[in-house]
Amino acid sequence: MRPESYAHVWDALQAVRALRRFTQGVSEEEYLSDLMLSSAVERQFEILGEALNRVRRSDPQTADNIPDIHRIIGMRNIIAHEYGSVDGRLVWAAATTHVVALETVLSGFLQDAQRPE
């Protein structure tokens, strides 16, 4: 991983961890009916997608090893620019299932890389 990507991977990992905390112990129906919670989850997806987009631009080799990077960036773009067409059930599914593996990958990148000075 390139040194300049470290901060972006860190930001992405923090967003993933927030997503996991926000959705832990919450049902899909509770999520869908709670505007504050759904807004918080969507915000973390915006951060996650933007951080991964920066990794993709600055460090394509690392980006190639991030599962579903293009889908995550795409979700970020939909949330940010097509907010009226966001499907809460898809966001819920991504937040509760797909980010688990991503946390492992991002943690591994940070463990393998030395933090830049």
Regions flagged by a language model, labelled:
Residues 1-117:
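Solvent-exposed interaction patches of small proteins and small membrane subunits
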